[in-house]
């Protein structure tokens, strides 16, 4: 009996141990499970929905595990959205980068394309400038050679001392018409001759007439050289003739000025009546006329050269024609500037002489200056040697040097030696002014061009 009772107790104790004990945590979980079952059944039974109780909603909203599950689900959605957005942004950035690279390549290509023609134009412009400078130097050299050779012919031409003795007879009234005659045959700087007109009309002609101006200038230079050789031969002959005729007393005398020369030329056949005047004028050696004819011949040759170029230059290429025409225009421009500078210096020197007309020794100073320094053109020498406004100076210039005597010549030479530094300073100042005017004209031409 006792054993049976013990077994029964053991069985009861085992059953009691095997039965679950309901704790508060288990109660909450069971309620949550029931609410989840209700929600699932509600979603599955859509045609005939089973409403979820309010208690289940409250338990589900209060349970942290369900909230974490829902948050986790939302995070997954957000991550997916972020992934899609990142992919879109990457594609957009790639497109932008590619477009930016294309723009950079285009921008880099454009300056290279623009730099190449700029370099080409700079090279062409530098070559053109060098050629223009060379042409201008050649033109200046030719002008200086022609201007330097012509004035040398005038001092060499002159009668001997016998003619000077005969010059004492004519009076003041007869000097004015005789000396005014050679001045009328000379070209004045204010009224340009046909050469200046052709230079002014040259740019208006067609480009074909200008295409080979440099070759024409070279031809002119050769012609000028030949003419200069002829002039030198004629000068040597003319110098030899008066040396043979003149006595040895002419060795110590200074060469007479141009005003003296003009009076000497007019003196030998001068009686006091009007017919004698005409004969004296006809008996003058035509030095001024010969120079004028020589300049006229040069102008005619220069006028013929563009016509020949216009006839024979039509077969050239258009680019060469344009280039040669530009060079021809530039050469003409530089030559005009040189002529203007020379004219300005000549006018300034003449103004300085007019201010110093009151000095009685001016004619002798001019003779010494003409001998010692040598001016550029024949026109300047004639103007400095002859001044029709001052009769006293012209009378003193016309008197022979033998009458004045040797001591007077010594005094005049000493005075001229004292005045030479002043004359040198004046000439240097005038040369500086001429250079400054040339530079100013060049700057104006460059600004206009």
Curated annotation (Swiss-Prot):
Modified how: In secretory granules, is attacked at both N- and C-terminal sides by proteolytic enzymes generating numerous peptides of various activities. Proteolytic processing can give rise to additional longer forms of catestatin peptides which display a less potent catecholamine release-inhibitory activity.
GO CC terms, sorted: chromaffin granule; extracellular region; extracellular space; neuronal dense core vesicle; secretory granule; transport vesicle
Disulfide bonds: 35-56
Sites of Methionine sulfoxide modification: 364
Glycan-carrying positions: 185, 204, 249, 416
Source organism, top-level taxon: Eukaryota
Cleavable signal peptide: 1-18
Modified positions (Phosphotyrosine) in chain numbering: 191
PROSITE patterns from the UniProt entry: GRANINS_1, GRANINS_2
Pfam families per record: Granin
Molecular function GO labels: calcium ion binding
In-chain residues carrying the UniProt-annotated modification Glycine amide: 312
Compositional bias per record (Basic and acidic residues), positions renumbered to this chain: 107-140, 233-242, 279-297, 323-351, 406-423
Keywords: Amidation, Antibiotic, Antimicrobial, Calcium, Cleavage on pair of basic residues, Cytoplasmic vesicle, Disulfide bond, Fungicide, Glycoprotein, Oxidation, Phosphoprotein, Proteoglycan, Secreted, Signal
Gene Ontology biological-process annotations: defense response to bacterium; defense response to fungus; defense response to Gram-negative bacterium; defense response to Gram-positive bacterium; innate immune response; killing of cells of another organism; mast cell activation; mast cell chemotaxis
Location, primary (coarse class): cytoplasm
Region (Disordered) location: 87-431
Note: Binds calcium with a low-affinity.
Complex formation: Self-interacts; self-assembly is promoted in vitro by chondroitin sulfate attachment which occurs at mildly acidic pH conditions. Interacts with SCG3. Interacts with ITPR1 in the secretory granules.
Protein name per its UniProtKB record: Chromogranin-A
Organism, scientific name: Bos taurus (Bovine)
Taxonomic lineage of the native organism: Eukaryota, Metazoa, Chordata, Craniata, Vertebrata
